[in-house]
Each structure stands twice: as C-alpha cells, then as structure tokens.
Amino acid sequence: MNDFELIAKTFMGLESVLAKELTQIGANNVQIGRRMVSFTGDKEMMYRANFQLHTAIRILKPIAKFKAASADDVYEEIKKIDWSQYIEKGKTFSVDSVVYSEEFRNSRFVTYKVKDAIVDQFREKTGTRPNISVSNPDIRLNIHIAETAATLSLDSSGESLHRRGYRQESVEAPLNEVLAAGMILMTGWKGETDFIDPMCGSGTLAIEAALIARNMSPGVFRKEFAFEKWPDFDAELFDTIYNDDSQEREFTHHIYGYDIDMKAVNTARLNVRAAGLSKDITIDCADFKDFTKPAEKSILVVNPPYGERISTPNLLNTYKMIGERLKHAFMGNEAWVLSYRQECFEAIGLKPSIKIPVFNGSLECEFRKYSIFDGTMKEFRQEGGIVKTEDEKRQMAEKHRFKKNREFKKRLDEDAENAEADIRSFKFRSFERRKDNDDRRGSFGGKRFNRDEEKSFGGKRFDRDEEKSFGKRGGKSFGRGRDGEKSFGKGFKGDRKGGRGFNKKGFDDED
C-alpha cells in the first residue's frame, strides 16, 4: 500500500506523548505540531492509529491543500475535487471547520461554503444532491484554515476517540479519557507496580491504567469508526487488526481506586465491569485522609478537585491533607498530582521533582511528580535513588520550551478573533515588561532587582474532596480512623467485552 499524510489531533501538552505512541506503532515521518502530530502511513496505519492510540482525539486524512483569500476561493477550490470518489450516491456528509484567519471570522460561513460547493457539484453532474447529516453522517469532512492556508481532510474517526465506549455513567466533571491516558503515559508507568488513584471519581484513571498495563487497544470498546463507511473500506484488513491481541501482555500487579463518595464508587465499579477489567481493578469507598502505607511498591496518580466545576469546601485543607498523607504514608514511592491552582500545590508542602503543563479542557494545569523518600535529596541520590529519568528530563525540556514560546495564557478555542486578541495582548504585555525593566534600570542606577514571578496555570488550582485509601492486592488493609481497619478485597469479576455488540451511552467530546 502507498503511504499518505495523516494528522492525529490531541490536547495541548500531550503532543510529545502522542508522537511517541505513533512511533511505537510504526508510523513514519512523525512531526509534532500544536495540538496535533502529523505522520505518514498506509491504510493499515490509519486503522491502527484509530484503534490503538491512547492519546489521539481523532485521525484526519488530508485530501486537498490550497490557498484561499476569500469565501469564494474556498468554494471554487472545493468544487475542483471529484466528490464522487468520496461520497457515494445516497450517502450523507457533514463539515467541521476550524478557522484562524482575519479573512474568515466565522467558521460557520466556511462550513456553508464547503457544503454548497459539494452539493452544487453533485446537482450539476447528476441532477441530485447528497443530504447533510450533523448527528451521524456517512462521511465527515474537516477544513482547517490558518490565515490563507487551507487543508481539507476526511475525518477517519467519527466521534471523538476519547469516547472509548466503556463509560456507562459518570460523576460531575469527569476526567477526559485521552487526558487520563496521557497523564499515565507521562509517568512512565506500564504496569511494573501497583497503581493507586485515591480520588477515582468515575474510575477513568484506573481503567486507562489497566488498558496501558495490559497494552490493550482502547478502540476495542467502540462500535464503529468513520472509515468503516468509506467507499474503499477494507473490512478484512480491519478485522485482522481488531482481532489481533498478540501485543497484549500479562499484568501481575493490581490497580486500586478509592473515593469518599459512595455514588462515585458505584459508578466507577459499573464502568470497570463494563470494560471487563474487574480482575485488575478494585474500587472501594475510603477517605484519603485514612490512607496507610501500601504493602506493595506503588505509584499514585490523583486528579483532586480544582474548585472550578466542582465546589469543594476547605479546598486548601484538602491539598494540605494530600501532602501530609504522601509524606507519612507513601515513603519509598512516587506520586503524581494534576492541579490547577498554584496555592493548592503550595498547600501540599512537598517539593516536586517534575512540573509538566497540560490542559484539562480550557484550564491550563500542571502535572507534578513527587518522589517521597527519607532524609535529604543528597542521601537519596547516594543510595541510588533517581529523581528524574532521562525521559523525564527530555520531557521537562520540551515542556519548558513549549511554555516559554506559547503565545496564549488560555487554551485556544477555534475562534480566530479571540486568538488575534490574545496575540495582541501577549505582545503588549511583553512590551510593557521590557519598558518596566528599562525604567527600573534608569531609576536605580542600573542595578537589577528580582521580581517575584508567580506561575499562572490558567487561573487558580483546585481540589476535589473525593478520595480514598489503599490496600493490598486482593484485600489491602487501610486504616479507617482509630477504631480499626477496613479490608479492601478484589472487585467484580467481568469478562472483557468487545466494542461491536457493546451498548454504550453518548458522551461529550470534552468532559
């Protein structure tokens, strides 16, 4: 098969993680962009990218690139394409537009021009026109315009790839599956130890951890992909990919999820059971403040409340409790915390060894690693302890460059006018900073003065009061206050379920 260009979309901050995934599944010419990674591959690679990638939101196949200075240019260029190759008689289509341009201030107008060009071509050639379907089209198109550079692509995924298909119910403000998988992959964990999420909510981190530990393809739960409706769909090839579990591996440790809210616990258990992963995951009701040291070496990954979408009383006290529990009950292990407010991180009271900026929806968060050990850092290193792996050092360097050069404080939406306003605001602030420095040097005889620089993460940080305690595989013990211990046994046993006959509910593209 011949190779062609493909584009994998993702969240800002996960580009390098996605690029590594693409390299591992055999993609060629992998290039990192903003919220996307381009690569080349054949039809099999396109199918595998949709089916196997944990951190991709959707996979696009560009079919035309052109310059457009006006809406009429877009119309004429789209009409040049032979649409009978892509849209068969009786099939429906839809168009999604992403526009960053002074010439095209309204992305909907671009959408209409693309639709008009396609419909007019069919009407002129055949006397009939294809129908538009927004909810469930046969062919999905995506047009991306940056100033005058336009790229028209076929969307091979359909609904967002974060919609795995295992989530039956969710709690308030659930963590996006793609972000959860990206967080776990950034830690470097692949199932070598037990995994703990003390504030598990609907169980997303625990389920994504199990998929990564077993190297299971997240697409196994989905009912369909958009490419299955394409005229050139190769059903035999995709069935081969779908049924190939040769890359899956054994997982000899265990995953524990805890939450203080029994409703969240029941929701997480339902989702774990739907994913057929009850053998690997135990979900129980427990409070993080009662967390005792796990019997087995473990990694802890937690997404506490931020105080944004979920109102959390005593937010800073929650983070203070997290720091206290990590310090006294997690010695010899490592913990990773995702948060949004700087003051919440400060309340933890521990020095992070790694800080990685990532976006949770529109919130610019940080994902921090804490290596918990006795004594001083020097003593820890002398005993062979590793604070940062080589991969983590490279990751930090990439993220620092990413943050330094980023033009926007908030995550860009698809509105060109807002994007331009952010750029102008950024340039103005940069100019004002330089002016302030010049004024200070002039006023104080050229002496330099240190300014207190506070890192901003899109606003204040958060915390969720849901979370638990941990125990041993098959029944770890956790202290529940002074009166005794609670035993946490293994959860439900369930068979792994494939996506084809799997009933699921719909979820939003972004949680």
Which role fits each region the language model picked out?
Residues 1, 369-511:
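Basic Arg/Gly/Lys-rich low-complexity intrinsically disordered segments
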Residues 5, 9, 13, 254, ...:
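Conserved Class I SAM-dependent methyltransferase catalytic core
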Residues 175-293, 308, 316:
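Conserved S-adenosyl-L-methionine
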Residues 297-303:
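Short SAM/SAH-binding signature in class I
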